[in-house]
Swiss-Prot record:
Assigned GO CC terms: signal recognition particle
Domain commentary: Composed of three domains: the N-terminal N domain, which is responsible for interactions with the ribosome, the central G domain, which binds GTP, and the C-terminal M domain, which binds the RNA and the signal sequence of the RNC.
UniProt catalytic activity: GTP + H2O = GDP + phosphate + H(+)
The organism of origin for this protein: Methanocella arvoryzae (strain DSM 22066 / NBRC 105507 / MRE50)
SMART domains for this protein: AAA, SRP54, SRP54_N
Main EC class the enzyme belongs to: hydrolase
Family, as annotated: Belongs to the GTP-binding SRP family. SRP54 subfamily.
Gene: srp54
Positions with a binding annotation for GTP: 104-111, 184-188, 242-245
SUPFAM superfamilies the record matches: Domain of the SRP/SRP receptor G-proteins (SSF47364), P-loop containing nucleoside triphosphate hydrolases (SSF52540), Signal peptide-binding domain (SSF47446)
GO terms for MF: 7S RNA binding; ATP hydrolysis activity; GTP binding; GTPase activity
Protein name per Swiss-Prot or TrEMBL: Signal recognition particle 54 kDa protein
E.C. no: 3.6.5.4
Superkingdom: Archaea
Length: 444
């Protein structure tokens, strides 16, 4: 999950609210100090932190809870809404024909990000192409071409041409039939006059629908200075924050967005091609606090799963065979890394107890289960009760696993079957209310 340490610290602060006998000034002061400490450790700008904490404190002490909500729930909602406000609104990026200019510092991950954003549009049913305008970095052309070929998106570049403006002009003509054209400019330092002029010249070639600045989350509060310089040069319309999954200082990049009155368009949360997500403020904070992001989960499922991948209705009726579990594991593998999928679920305090080693072990276990099920007959997968000691030995031998691992799989299936039956009695989906959020977070 992005900004793991910040999320853990914020959840700890919110538990103090939920576990307090009453909400008074002393409790509010203590919680606000915890929030301040957590945000500053994540490299969020101090002025922004002070403004946030002042707003939370003022609202918590002066506002009366609305009808049907107690004081604990009300303060929790205040913290949640103010955290959403601090990250700002998302940059609207429509699923339609458009031209996008990508700018950023050297080493920000801009070239990879350009290809991943093209992949995002392809997943949505559009036809994207990336134009390579980086004529300075050795290997930029080859890297981007290989990425685009791998991801199945269009590519245009001129390996021997050093005139970036001419390349973009030609590329826009050649790729005119593509829905989305993404121009990957050379990485630069904001104070390099010649490169800034080149960027302005490219900007003057066409009406760009978006000018997206790529920021590496790890650069911390230096992001603000860079964002202002790029904004002054071409007027950026949105920010893409990369590598949020690998740094404790992502708050600096978030501060830069607020500091320049821009907004976030995409966030990079992993290394795979599908780990570039449209930014959703509510979902981002919800995931940060361990409340999950069911909207993102449903969106990811809709993108990668076929209609018949998982028979949900049959499973909810209580009939959950090994075939169903096999389909479920296949679906999980299609949707991406387990850690990322788990971050979209409302695990509350449980999520923070799962280490990276545990995720890896669990992912390996799931792969092992699939190998075991491949060694079963269709009848055995449809009715696990058929699998006695002799069949366990046969399946273990055929899969290269131990009999204990086969028994563990059968035990896991029983647990999942029981869980599916329990879900049958659950209420309709939708956003959780504050009481459910408190329970999910391990609060009283």
């Amino acid at each position: 999950m992005v900004l793991d340490n910040l999320g853990t610290s914020l959840k700890d602060a919110l538990r103090k609210i939920a576990n307090s006998g009453k909400i008074d000034k002393e409790v509010i002061d203590e919680v606000v100090k915890d929030i301040q400490r957590a945000m500053i450790q994540a490299d969020v700008n101090v002025k922004l932190v002070m403004k946030l904490s002042s707003t939370i404190k003022n609202r918590a002490l002066t506002e009366a809870p609305p009808a049907g909500m107690n004081s604990k729930e009300h303060v929790l909602r205040i913290v949640y809404t103010e955290l959403v406000n601090i990250v700002g609104k998302a940059t609207p990026v429509a699923l339609q024909s458009q031209t996008i200019m990508m700018v950023g510092l050297q080493g920000s991950g801009k070239t990879t990000t350009s290809a991943k954003i093209a992949r995002y549009f392809a997943r949505k049913g559009l036809k994207p192409a990336v134009i390579c305008a980086d004529t300075y970095r050795p290997g930029a052309y080859d890297q981007l071409k290989q990425l685009c070929d791998k991801l199945g998106v269009g590519f245009y570049g001129e390996a021997g041409n050093k005139d970036a403006v001419a390349i973009v002009r030609n590329g826009l003509k050649e790729m005119a039939k593509y829905d989305v054209k993404i121009v990957d400019t050379a990485g630069r330092h904001a104070l390099e006059t010649d490169l800034i002029q080149e960027m302005k010249d490219i900007y003057g070639l066409t009406k760009f629908d978006h000018k997206l600045l790529v920021l590496d989350a790890a650069i911390g509060q230096q992001a603000s200075e860079q964002a202002r310089a790029f904004n002054d040069a071409i007027g950026i319309t949105g920010v893409v924050i990369t590598k949020l999954d690998g740094t404790a200082k992502g708050g600096g990049a978030l501060s830069a967005v607020s500091d320049t009155n821009t907004s976030i368009a995409f966030i990079g949360v992993g290394e795979t091609p599908d780990d570039m997500e449209r930014f959703d403020p509510d979902g981002f904070i919800s995931r940060l606090l361990g409340m999950g992001d069911l909207r993102a989960l449903v969106e990811r499922a809709n993108e990668v799963l076929q209609k018949d991948d998982v028979n949900v209705e049959k499973m909810m009726q209580g009939k959950f065979t090994l075939n169903d579990m096999y389909d479920q594991l296949e679906a999980i593998n299609k949707m991406g890394p387990l850690k990322q999928i788990m971050s979209m679920l409302p695990l509350g305090g449980l999520g923070g107890n799962i280490t990276d080693d545990m995720y890896k072990m669990t992912q390996d276990k799931l792969k092992g289960y699939k190998v075991i099920m491949d060694s079963m007959t269709a009848a055995e997968r449809d009715d696990p009760k058929l699998i006695g000691s002799s069949r366990i030995a046969r399946v273990a031998h055929g899969s290269g696993k131990s009999p204990e691992e086969v028994r563990e799989l059968l035990k896991y299936h029983k647990m999942m079957q029981k869980a599916m039956k329990g879900m049958k009695g659950g209420g309709p989906g939708g956003k959780m209310n504050m009481q459910k959020i408190m329970k999910q977070m391990g609060m009283k």
